[in-house]
Amino acid sequence: MLRVEQLSKSFGQVEAIKDITVEFAQGEFNCIVGPSGCGKTTLLKCLSGLMPPTGGRVALDGVTVTRPPKQMALVFQDYSRSLFPWMTVRQNVAFPLRNKGLAKSEITRLVEEAVEAVGLTHAIDRYPWQLSGGMQQRTSIARAIAYQPEILLMDEPFASVDAQTRANLEDLMLSIKARYGMTILFVTHDIDESVYLGDRIVVLSSSPTVVQEILTVPLPVARDQITTKEDPQFLHLRSHVFREIMAAQAG
């Protein structure tokens, strides 16, 4: 269980996050949305232990997070800068496992399983510069899941790819959730994406940020890009989230 308790974050006199209290249950896919500049990335950095809060706390299984926990992995938006260009896909995915005290055979197994899960077995010995943008982001995701985190944090991971690649990566995330059962916190600006992927949607207000609303997504677990997005429940929830974000922008 990841719990955020009265979290606040200020930069000098500027209050970015005012007061956030929310819980994230094991195995839940949580999408975090809100107006541009509302502090979504700042919140994610506080949750991951990369940035200390000004007030309140983040607790993982009852223990206050003061540094990046071993149970967490983070996937960034800029995949091109998160991969080592001199390493192959195999080597990039294996990199964070080197200090876990695992046998070489176990590292090989975890790497190959993660690469297979993201559909890159055929490219496992290629370098990042030999991959498309979507394949590079798949490599970043493989590296995160090979680490076997309890919680996967993702900061607008599909913002820099084209629409078709984005749809493919969204479906990849649904398969990863089903396969690994990890808790996922997924920051996005894309309302359709939040409804399509999420078990819950956390809507943030404009800055200084509070939780404006938490919505449960009533869609079936099995989803696809056409049928799900034509579902009246999908359309209704998308409109509701859009109205909430517009209201937040208006103050």
Q: For the regions a protein language model found, what residue spans apply to each?
A:
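Conserved ABC ATPase signature
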Residues: 127-131, 135
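A short, proline-enriched helix->beta-strand linker immediately N-terminal to the Walker B motif
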Residues: 146-150
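Conserved ABC ATPase "signature" region
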Residues: 98, 105-123, 175
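Conserved ABC transporter NBD signature motif
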Residues: 56-68
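Catalytic Walker B motif of ABC-type/P-loop ATPase nucleotide-binding domains
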Residues: 152-155
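The feature captures the beta-strand-to-loop junction immediately N-terminal to the Walker
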Residues: 33-35
